[in-house]
Amino acid sequence: MPAPYRPDPVDYLLSADAIRQVKARYCRYIDTKQWDRLGSLFTPDCRFEGLGSAPPGADVATFVAGVSSRLGPTISVHHCHTLEIEMTGADTARVIWAMEDFVEFTDGSTVKETPGSKGFRGYGHYEEEYRRENGRWRIAFLRLTRLRLDPVPVDAPAPRMGQRQASTDWLESN
C-alpha cells in the first residue's frame, strides 16, 4: 500500500482555505439564485449523487438546470461547516462538510421529501472531491447524504424576508 500523501504545510493551508471559499460560494450562489455563476465552481467532468434536483451521475449542466428549476421558487438557506479535509495528492482533496439546509417553496408546491409540507429543514453531510486545475480549486464530485429531514408544515406562518437582501456582486464589485 502506498504511503499517504503528505502535503507541504503551507500549501495545505492555502489549499484548505481555497476549498472553503469554493464551498462558501456554492451555498451563496444557490441561496441568492445566481445560477449563471454556480456552474463555474465545478470541474467540467464533475458528477453528482444524492440530490433531489439531479439524477445520480448528472453532469454540471444537468445539475445547474435541475437545481435552478427546483429551488427557483424557494427561500433557501444552506450552511456548511466543520469540514474534514484530506489532501489525496498535490492537486486533489477529499472533503466532508457537515450541512444544514432550509428550503421553503413559495409557489404553493409541496415537497416529495416531506409529503404534505411546503418545505423542509435538513441535516447531513456533503462528501466531495476537489481538483486544482490551472491553479484553481473546483468541485469534481459532490454527494449529499441526509441524517434527518424535518417538514415545514403547509400551515406554517408565511415567510418574512429579511430587512436587506443579499448583494449578489458584493465581492466581485472590487
Task: Give the ranges of each region predicted by the language model.
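Solvent-exposed, flexible loop/coil residues
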Residues: 17, 52, 151-153
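Generic alpha-helical secondary structure signal
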Residues: 30-33, 52, 67, 130, ...
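A beta-strand edge to alpha-helix "cap/lid" segment located at domain peripheries
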Residues: 2-7, 72-79, 86-174
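Short, low-complexity N-terminal intrinsically disordered segments enriched in polar/charged residues
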Residues: 1-28, 32, 36, 40, ...
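A solvent-exposed, acidic/Ser-Thr-rich amphipathic alpha-helical stretch
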Residues: 35-106
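Sparse, context-dependent recognition of short Cys/His-centered cofactor- or disulfide-binding micro-motifs
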Residues: 4, 14, 23, 31-33, ...
